[in-house]
Every structure is written in structure tokens, then in C-alpha cells.
């Protein structure tokens, strides 16, 4: 979570060689990385390449075909939005950190991020179970288990943001709030019947406010290109 001692702007000439974020914005992982990079003030270019419809093209960039992938200025390819945002936090030229420095607040933020990332994961598993598995092979016990995990994640997040509402502005939003907003919007697009908005008013309000921010608007959910704000 912290910059290495030998890390300096001289080792990362971002203005000359901006980083390349690879993946589609219908992925919550790609989207949270794109929004995070904007809020950190780090220049990057986005390539909307699908791990499904353009598999071969993605494989040319990263043989593992994992989104998001980040091509660093020296050509190194990083994967996983958690690791990409951790790397981005290490740049000294960033505008600000999206993570608190106080240990207790950091613990709370990481818990929220973990809940939101789990919500993303379980939403994806539900979609895959319905859309990729043949109907006659649908495994109801597994689907019930995954749905239960999703509901527990959002129950905990709703309680957290009801108890401690956050200011949602470009200058104040943190990684925990950002990730929760991205996760909720994603789940509502794909599994709205599992997580009805009326049961989660705090999360619905948080998402609505976040989607109005320029950094979110510049990276809209879907198959478009992030126009970095």
C-alpha cells in the first residue's frame, strides 16, 4: 500500500509513455481501476478489449487474458484491480491518496473494499451460472449459496454506509466508497432481482451520487472507452 523507497517520478515518465488500461468498462474491476487512476491524477489510455469477443487480441497483450491488465510505462503488465490500484498509489506525483493513513481507518476501509469486491465476484458467479451453464445443468444449491453470500456482503455494506454516510465528491471520495459504488451499480445492472434497490437505500443513494462525478461519467459502465477526466 505504500511507495517503495527507490520509487521516483524519474523512473516512471508517465507524460511521455502513459500507462495502458486494458479491458471493458462493463467489468467492475476495470471500471474501478479507470476511476481510481483518474482520481489519483495519473495519465493513462484505455483500450476497450473484451476477454470474450476479442480473446485473441487480448491474448497478444497478456497471454493470461485477464481484465483489467495494466501495461506500465516500461512494458510490464500488471493484473488484478487491487494490485493495479496499489501500484498507482505508489506514484509520488499522484494528486492524493484514496486510502487513509490512520491504521484504524485503513482497517475499516479494507474491510469495506473486501465486501464490495466479494459482491462483484458473487454477482459474476450468478450471471455465469445462468448464462454459461446449460439450463439442465443449473446447480441450485450452488446458486443459493452464492446468492446468500452476495446478500450478506450488501447487508454489511448497507449497514456501514447507513451508520457512516460518506461525502461523495471528487475531492473526498475514497477507495472504499468508490469500490462500493462501482460494485452496487454493476450488481444492479446484472442481478437486480437479487438485490432490489428498495432494500438498500444507503447504497442506492451512494451509487446515484457517485455516478454524477466526472470521473465516473468519463468511465461509464458498458463497452465504451474511458475518456479520462
Residue positions per predicted region:
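Aromatic-glycine hotspot motif
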Residues: 70, 82, 150-153, 157-158, ...
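Amphipathic alpha-helical surface "interface" segments used
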Residues: 105, 179, 227-229
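GST-like domain detector, emphasizing the conserved glutathione-binding G-site
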Residues: 2-140
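Short, hydrophobic secondary-structure boundary micro-motifs
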Residues: 96-101, 136, 166-170, 217-222
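Long hydrophobic alpha-helical segments typical of transmembrane helices together
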Residues: 197-229
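Non-transmembrane alpha-helical segments in soluble domains
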Residues: 85, 89, 110-113, 154, ...
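GST-like fold's C-terminal all-alpha helical module
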Residues: 116-208
Amino acid at each position: 500500500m505504500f511507495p517503495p523507497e527507490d520509487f521516483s517520478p524519474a523512473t516512471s515518465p508517465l507524460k511521455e509513455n502513459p500507462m495502458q488500461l486494458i479491458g471493458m468498462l462493463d467489468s467492475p474491476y476495470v471500471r474501478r481501476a479507470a476511476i481510481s487512476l483518474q482520481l489519483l491524477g495519473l495519465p493513462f489510455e484505455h483500450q476497450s478489449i473484451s476477454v470474450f469477443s476479442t480473446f485473441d487480441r487480448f491474448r497478444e497483450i497478456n497471454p493470461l487474458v485477464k481484465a483489467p491488465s495494466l501495461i506500465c510505462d516500461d512494458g510490464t503488465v500488471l493484473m488484478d484491480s487491487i494490485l493495479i490500484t496499489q501500484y498507482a498509489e505508489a506514484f509520488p506525483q499522484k494528486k492524493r491518496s484514496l486510502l487513509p493513513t490512520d491504521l484504524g481507518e485503513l482497517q475499516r476501509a479494507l474491510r469495506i473494499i473486501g465486501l464490495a469486491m466479494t459482491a462483484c465476484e458473487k454477482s459474476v458467479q450468478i450471471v455465469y451460472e445462468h448464462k454459461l451453464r446449460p439450463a439442465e445443468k443449473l446447480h441450485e444449491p450452488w446458486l443459493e449459496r452464492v446468492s446468500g453470500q452476495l446478500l450478506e456482503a450488501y447487508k454489511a455494506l448497507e449497514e456501514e454506509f447507513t451508520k457512516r454516510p460518506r461525502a461523495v465528491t471528487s475531492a473526498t471520495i475514497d477507495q472504499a466508497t468508490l469500490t462500493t459504488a462501482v460494485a452496487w451499480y454493476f450488481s444492479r445492472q446484472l442481478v437486480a432481482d437479487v438485490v432490489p434497490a428498495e432494500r438498500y437505500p444507503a447504497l442506492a443513494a451512494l451509487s446515484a451520487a457517485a455516478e454524477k462525478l466526472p470521473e465516473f461519467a468519463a468511465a461509464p459502465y458498458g463497452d465504451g472507452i474511458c475518456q479520462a477526466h
